[in-house]
């Protein structure tokens, strides 16, 4: 795990005594990047953990509830081992929010975990004053839009404009249309923090999904994800689209 924490509060940078932790204050949420597409968001009342795949989790406050979100069944977005890790830490109140495409045989095997199965284009009321809206992924499962007392959080999962070199033009056009339809559902909302795919495997199409999102959605801060160990793709995006430097940040350094 790259243990980097962002405290959303006053738009100020702080460096902790540990050299590998950089803290950015913007509002009232602490955000830790875990790995790939996984992030931990801490508020005053609870934790939200998105798309855990692998790597170590930070030390958690066992008195707080934790909501574990899994956007779909792909192995780089869901690993039921996360529930064992949480139990090992002594977490007492664990609530899993799992996309319906995740097989029940891959549900947590430990007792005392509440499970909510979710599907696309639905609204759900969660504890801690949290509202959840789901979008339809262009790949598998859902994307998550959370509204909590501390702000609004968007985690795309695999909702992206998955255009690929060599694919039939018609399929790429259909993909773009499907993606844009979903993003337009966010029109009129203000999102405080968004976690969006920026995948170098798409080659010349790598920026299409993020660029459209930034054009259409009122978002304050974006952290790219799903870049398969190549954070240099963020530098490329910011070089090609410098107008978004004040929004799109370096995920592994928060710069």
Residue ranges and their predicted role:
Residues 54-101, 184-195:
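Active-site metal-binding motif and surrounding structural segment of the metallo-beta-lactamase
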Residues 178-185, 203-212:
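A short, acidic, amphipathic alpha-helical segment used as a generic capping/interface helix at domain edges
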Residues 15-63, 114-190, 252-255:
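Core dinuclear metal-dependent hydrolase active-site scaffold
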Residues 49-50, 69, 153-156, 195, ...:
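Structural motif
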Residues 55-57, 74-78, 102-106, 140-142, ...:
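Active-site environment of divalent metal-dependent phosphoester hydrolases
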Residues 29-36, 95, 108-124, 206-255:
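Binuclear metal-ion centers of metallo-dependent hydrolases, dominated by the metallo-beta-lactamase
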């Amino acid at each position: 795990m790259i243990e980097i924490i962002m405290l959303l509060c006053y738009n100020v940078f702080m460096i902790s005594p540990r050299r590998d932790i950089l803290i950015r204050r913007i509002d009232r949420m602490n955000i830790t990047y875990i790995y790939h597409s996984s992030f931990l968001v801490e508020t005053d009342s609870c934790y939200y953990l998105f798309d855990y795949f692998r790597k170590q989790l930070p030390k958690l406050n066992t008195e707080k509830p934790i909501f574990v979100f899994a956007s779909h069944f792909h192995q780089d977005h869901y690993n039921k081992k996360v529930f064992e890790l949480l139990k090992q830490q002594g977490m007492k109140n664990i609530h899993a929010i799992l996309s319906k495409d995740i097989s029940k045989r891959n549900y947590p095997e430990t007792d005392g975990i509440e499970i909510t199965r979710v599907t696309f284009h639905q609204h759900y009321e969660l504890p801690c004053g949290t509202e959840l809206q789901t979008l339809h992924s262009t790949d598998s499962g859902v994307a998550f839009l959370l509204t909590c007392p501390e702000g609004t959080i968007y985690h795309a999962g695999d909702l992206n404009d998955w255009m690929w070199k060599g694919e039939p033009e018609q399929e790429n056009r259909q993909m773009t249309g499907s993606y844009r339809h979903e993003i337009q559902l966010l029109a009129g909302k203000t999102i405080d923090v968004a976690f969006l795919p920026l995948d170098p495997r798409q080659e010349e199409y790598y920026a299409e999904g993020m660029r459209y999102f930034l054009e259409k959605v009122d978002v304050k801060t974006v952290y790219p994800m799903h870049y398969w160990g190549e954070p240099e793709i963020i530098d490329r995006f910011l070089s090609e689209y410098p107008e978004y430097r004040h929004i799109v940040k370096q995920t592994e350094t928060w710069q």
